[in-house]
Amino acid sequence: MGFYHVGQAAFELLTSSFILVGFSDRPHLELIVFVVVLIFYLLTLLGNMTIVLLSALDSRLHTPMYFFLANLSFLDMCFTTGSIPQMLYNLWGPDKTISYVGCAIQLYFVLALGGVECVLLAVMAYDRYAAVCKPLHYTIIMHPRLCGQLASVAWLSGFGNSLIMAPQTLMLPRCGHRRVDHFLCEMPALIGMACVDTMMLEALAFALAIFIILAPLILILISYGYVGGTVLRIKSAAGRKKAFNTCSSHLIVVSLFYGTIIYMYLQPANTYSQDQGKFLTLFYTIVTPSVNPLIYTLRNKDVKEAMKKVLGKGSAEI
């Protein structure tokens, strides 16, 4: 009988659903947000797919820097595709529901891919450190095997972190509450629905955030501390400019991503503002992934030349 009740409870849980409130309390905003999100989503897919294809097709881009950049672009496509289609569906029509399983999958991938990006940005900072501070030994330091290992560490760290946090968040008692005051299943919003004390879970989340968010950020700051010292010792203005251009794109991306992530995940749940959270989530789920390709290509001569080469071949074949 006990097993029957457990099985019945599990079945009811898995077949239940959540209501994603999103912007339904501001219906005049829903159509505007739908159009904006759709445009940014298409730009994200186009821009990041372009970088992935260029990195694969142009032999000049078969370097550690572009290997990691292709990983970041693929990651951004996965990150947005894991959340944006459901968001567009809920914004477009009256149905604001998401199944429990759908919510679990969305939460898992949002946490996992966000964690991957934190670690991957640190790996890219180390690559820039090796390129600027150890130029004569760069190809020895950043050999293909190490690049593959560093990328694997980034992906495994993010998915491992989510494997701990996602189930813990989903298993919180909610006393029948189904309304998620957000437009996606995000950890702070789901923790805020709990009808029990969440201090232990918040402590666990904070500890993991130190590992997955703050530790990579510290590595980034250390790497760029060394890079800055090396750049200041370069005597020629042209050399300093080249070294700065090598790193500036990555620094802009780090600032955009980490600025929102730290605010979202390193503050106590009782100080979390849902309205601020919604707009910050919009920023790092649609704006940052869409501008990443633009930031890298505008300052990168190699990517521009590769694009011209590929487009030139395409037009010649036509």
Swiss-Prot record:
CDD domains assigned: 7tmA_OR2W-like (cd15434)
Protein name: Putative olfactory receptor 2W6
GO cellular component: plasma membrane
One Pfam family matching this protein: 7tm_4
InterPro entries, per database record: GPCR_Rhodpsn, GPCR_Rhodpsn_7TM, Olfact_rcpt
Ranges that cross the membrane: 32-52, 64-84, 104-124, 146-166, 203-223, 246-266, 278-298
Protein topology in the membrane: Multi-pass membrane protein
Taxonomic placement: Eukaryota, Metazoa, Chordata, Craniata, Vertebrata
Subcellular location field: Cell membrane
Similarity annotation: Belongs to the G-protein coupled receptor 1 family.
Function of the molecule: Odorant receptor.
Organism: Homo sapiens (Human)
